[in-house]
Amino acid sequence: MWRKPDLDAQYGLTAISTYRTLLAIYPNSPLRDAAEQRAAKLEQWFATKDYKTGMYYLRRKAYDPAILYFRDVIRLYPNTPKSRDAYLRLVQAFHAIRYREDERETCMAVRQLYPSDKQVGLACAAYADSTALPSS
């Protein structure tokens, strides 16, 4: 079975597909709660895998692939803890390559989702007022 998110995800893909099929075909199954929990755990693992790949590229200043992976985490796994982290790394990547409009839009989105988060506040301090102009 798939035990580490860093490794080949083929078994994880098969497992999550099986859980989703089970939930779709048997919505009132007594195994529903267990299947939902295991599917959620697998989603966290997939989010972690993509996030770590994005971090690999970000550390090497390969911003375009890093942005793609972070956007995938946000799009595919929005309910996982790594989604918030991916937003923060997107802000960091956009700032590094001076994509101010993308940085501002990402800050606006992450502030709506996590309004009282301190790290979000620090990462998006330049955009505390959504009407503020980006700094250069």
What do these predicted regions represent?
Residues 1-136:
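Acidic, polar-rich low-complexity tracts and alpha-helical solenoid repeat scaffolds
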